[in-house]
Amino acid sequence: MVVREYNEELKYIEKISPNSYLIKKGFQPNMNVEGIFYANSKLERLMFDELRNSCRPGMTGGFLPGVKQIANVAALPGIVGRSVGLPDIHSGYGFAIGNMAAFDMSNPVSIVSPGGVGFDINCGVRLLRTNLFEKDVKPVQEQLAQSLFDHIPVGVGSKGIIPMNAHDLEEALEMGMDWSLREGYVWAEDKEHCEEYGRMLNADPSKVSMRAKKRGLPQLGTLGAGNHYAEIQVVEEIYDKFAASKMGIEELGQICVMIHSGSRGFGHQVATDALVEMEKAMKRDKIETNDRQLACARINSVEGQNYLKAMAAAANFAWVNRSSMTFLTRQAFAKQFNTTPDDLDMHVIYDVSHNVAKMEEHMVDGRPKQLLVHRKGSTRALPPHHPLIPVDYQLTGQPVLIGGSMGTCSFVLTGTEKGMAATFGSTCHGAGRSLSRAKSRRNLDYKDVLRDLEAKGIAIRVASPKLVQEEAPDSYKDVRDVVQTCHDVGISAKAIKLRPIAVIKG
């Protein structure tokens, strides 16, 4: 690794617009392309402080600073365009969380890297709307929060209540939301409002280890812990009335439900298994990287293809997982209001993935190319008229769901043409951590965090209260800064702001 004084490091980073910073070749060894990151004045300070701290004598161990991780990704074989850091970027395993990179599938040296997807494969967000308003929910806010908490299994060791045997799991891994539809857990239209229509077709359950399947079998239909949550939210602001109306959001005060979860222990095991195989492939094919956490394999190698097929199965697991929780959420609301989910208009606005690698067609140097786009802590954001988004959103662009930290606002954005050119149709995914989990536990008291939420009028139900400080707003960047930066640089556009009134956490 290159070790330089902080002032020397800064020579490789150039501010090219009010919210954009170029990372020049040479910042890290063997960079094939430049890097770029997006940050406003507040977010920029965090990026540079992290870099400055890493330059101090004796500062070793842990993850590299985000800006170094962006540059190391820029050195991977077959990368095209730039290695992109979104405004919510923070250090992660291999790739930073909030790092997007695309690889030319026609180039035989191009790679796929599990570190570019993350351990929680297809961690993502689903947003449901209702025809209820805050005035309808406020009188029963606590009861509704409890009903949701009772219906959805949450917490570290939570087990699902959706009936599932080994054969069902195999089918769910291959079919994704088509399995949920067949079993009666979703409405037919839910699939239309889901990235990839809730099913990655290249999934192959035979490429998944028995250990992963054993971990995943009891966990379908569970929220898990960490930063995962189910929130009852209120529409607080509408920035784009036309886009909001296409999503079924007409007025302020309307009630929505956001479900944030992923592939649980199943996806984690798929990633762990793949990293072992990738290290062998790297030795055989003499692939060198700047960081051993960037373990990878040629896309068209056996290991590369096996990972992509197993990753797709994990993505399908996550869509079935969120679909099962959608079913349970609809039941909880119907029970509380003594009606049906249909009568409550509990439609899915959209479902997006934040951790995935996908084959997509993009323009590179004026020509269409098939790319493998790695999005880790990054959301696909397709523009109006794109063939991969449903008819309902052809005029608005794809809805992009951005969850805030616990107790803070969330946003719905829309994809833009500029984003297609600048970031291969990618934008931020959330607030992004500013404190590590360990520092959060040391610096914050969970009782204070719970009191603050109650003071804001938020009903809170938590399976593991002592883990709450890890997810406190003080542990994260301000999601408003993140979203505004994306809006200002034009890679996505603000449509709706949502405020939580009830939070269910593991």
Swiss-Prot record:
Chain sites annotated for binding Mn(2+) 1:
120, 123, 228
Q: Which cofactor does it need?
A: Mn(2+)
A GO biological process of this protein is: tRNA splicing, via endonucleolytic cleavage and ligation
Q: What class of enzyme is it?
A: ligase
Instruction: List, from the UniProt record, the residues annotated as the active site of this protein.
Output: 429 (gmp-histidine intermediate)
Which reaction is recorded as catalysed by this protein?
a 3'-end 3'-phospho-ribonucleotide-RNA + a 5'-end dephospho-ribonucleoside-RNA + GTP = a ribonucleotidyl-ribonucleotide-RNA + GMP + diphosphate; a 3'-end 2',3'-cyclophospho-ribonucleotide-RNA + a 5'-end dephospho-ribonucleoside-RNA + GTP + H2O = a ribonucleotidyl-ribonucleotide-RNA + GMP + diphosphate + H(+)
UniProt: Mn(2+) 2 binding residues? 123, 260, 354
Give the record's cofactor note, including how many are bound.
Binds 2 manganese ions per subunit.
Any one GO CC term of this protein is:
tRNA-splicing ligase complex
Its EC number is 6.5.1.8
Query: What Pfam families does UniProt report for this protein, alphabetically?
Result: RtcB
Keyword Ribonucleoprotein among UniProt keywords = no
**Residues where GMP binds:** 227-231, 354-355, 403-406, 410, 429-432, 505
Give UniProt keywords alphabetically: GTP-binding, Ligase, Manganese, Metal-binding, Nucleotide-binding, tRNA processing
Molecular function (GO) terms for this protein are:
GTP binding; metal ion binding; RNA ligase (ATP) activity; RNA ligase (GTP) activity
Question: How does the annotation summarize its subunit structure?
Answer: Catalytic component of the tRNA-splicing ligase complex.
Briefly, what is this protein's role?
Answer: Catalytic subunit of the tRNA-splicing ligase complex that acts by directly joining spliced tRNA halves to mature-sized tRNAs by incorporating the precursor-derived splice junction phosphate into the mature tRNA as a canonical 3',5'-phosphodiester. May act as an RNA ligase with broad substrate specificity, and may function toward other RNAs.
Note from the entry = Ligation probably proceeds through 3 nucleotidyl transfer steps, with 2',3'-cyclic phosphate termini being hydrolyzed to 3'-P termini in a step that precedes 3'-P activation with GMP. In the first nucleotidyl transfer step, RTCB reacts with GTP to form a covalent RTCB-histidine-GMP intermediate with release of PPi; in the second step, the GMP moiety is transferred to the RNA 3'-P; in the third step, the 5'-OH from the opposite RNA strand attacks the activated 3'-P to form a 3',5'-phosphodiester bond and release GMP.
UniProt family annotation: Belongs to the RtcB family.
Q: What is this protein called?
A: RNA-splicing ligase RtcB homolog
Origin species, per record, is Aedes aegypti (Yellowfever mosquito)
